[in-house]
Amino acid sequence: MMSGSNSGRPALVLVAHGTRSPRGVELVAALAEEVAASVGPTRVAFVDVLGPSPSEVLRELDAPAVVIPAFLASGYHVHTDVPREVADSGNADVHVTPALGPDPVLAAVLLHRLREAGWQSGDAVVLAAAGSSDPRALTDVRRAAAMLAELTGDRVEIGYVATGEPRVPDVVARVRDESGRRVFVASYLLAHGLFHSRLADAGADGVAEPLGVHAELVRLLVSRYRAGVEAVRVTAGAGAAPRHRRRVLPVR
């Protein structure tokens, strides 16, 4: 899956989780198309469920690339899968950026999605995240909730869809019982898929759409790519040999 034309710049490889939902796959492709309009060649790879894998894409490119892990928290996929895929590709001219989230830009997009779903100031918000067994990812989710809370002006509770406790329906019920307010779920997911579909049964007064294709998200990806390109240039300018330029930045 490739978007854009060859411009002589490093290709961007957008790495997502993967989903069996055709709508989710189409959304990731559409996001790549929007980013490609600004940065040129953009490839999509997946670490699970479907292909191509990051290593397959990077081997096929056999050229400098900037990899953006399109994950909203830094768990196993970011710390283990992505670096392993880069190493397995044999492509030494790869720069891996930090994970996409958490980021204040994503919090702003979440707020926009909430408003689209009918949320109003004074309504309670539950942030629905996929979940992880990695404490670092859970810390990232808490940071994301804090960023969203700064924008809503109220506490944002956290519920998990797949891994971890408490589960989203339980949090929604508790918040409603304690506050007596309407409760909306902010979907801290990139695209539609199994996890987002589960939120329909959470018992909330409204469920926001996933982050999806949004102008601010596109600009964030473009910014991450350009920072990655600059890092490649700095490394090359320092006199590193071409086959020793692989660099994986520490995740946040």
Can you name each region flagged by the protein language model?
Residues M1-R252:
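Active-site-proximal alpha-helix that buttresses catalytic centers in soluble enzyme cores
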